[in-house]
Amino acid sequence: MQTISAYILAYNEAEKVKAATESVLWADEIVVVDSGSTDGTGEIAAALGARVVQVPFNGFGDLRNRAIEACNCDWIFSLDADERCTAAVRDEILGLLAGMPTFDAYQVPRRSFMMGRWIRGSGWYPNFRQPQLFRKGSMRYTLEPVHEGYELLTGKPLGTLRNAIWQFPFRDLEELMRKADRYSSLGAVKLAGKRVSMASAFGHGCWAFLKHYIFKRGFIDGWAGFVIAFGNFEGTFYRYAKRYEQAQDWSPPPVEPLRREEKP
């Protein structure tokens, strides 16, 4: 049977990396790609048998390409720290590798869990990202600062697994806000060279809310769907607002040193 490496990206994910690693203990090799965590993430993964590789963060595309280089098996299964493989996906993958897989790369459905429920709307199911199961050498990632793309290096089309993994994107609303801030900063880099205004930032934010809440049917998930849509408004608004800020000269006025005036 062909061998498989599972790689996990993690940065200060001490609360999540244990469960993620335990969900792929069936793999022939587990590689955790860490970017200088200070909360014990690497130590937790290593204690479970993972090989921890330190890679400086130069964008997610570069990070994932470095992860591929670190894997030694025939096939690679990509997992993020907030994702969990399921028994059904494990069995489906091992069944594929026991035979002759039809495709060289497969996308994997994800069921995302937030605010106590599986999110079915908001574009969150099947919520495919880049192919998560692929033969080593069959693809590489592109180098966008955020939401990195991929390039297939095979003549075969992309396959799809039948079963879904779990994703737990936000531990709580505080983490949602923190991630929105981080990703809006990375997204602002992608807008370099584009003319934006605060009005366009607001317009893009409103469209992001409507797209997720109405057109992607976020409303079917109650308040969780509203929070997701509002979070997309915030992330999109601040992405454009930060780009606008970068293009302005908003230096504060000079302040002269103030000393006590001498009395005559």
Please provide the spans of the model-predicted regions.
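Conserved donor nucleotide-binding strand/loop of the catalytic core
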Residues: G42-A70
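Short aromatic/hydrophobic "clamp" motif used to bind/position activated sugar donors
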Residues: I76
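Short, structured coil segments at secondary-structure junctions
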Residues: W26, A47-G49, R129, T154
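A conserved acidic beta->alpha catalytic loop
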Residues: S23, D34-I44, D80
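Short, well-formed alpha-helical segments that are part of the catalytic scaffolds
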Residues: Y7-E29
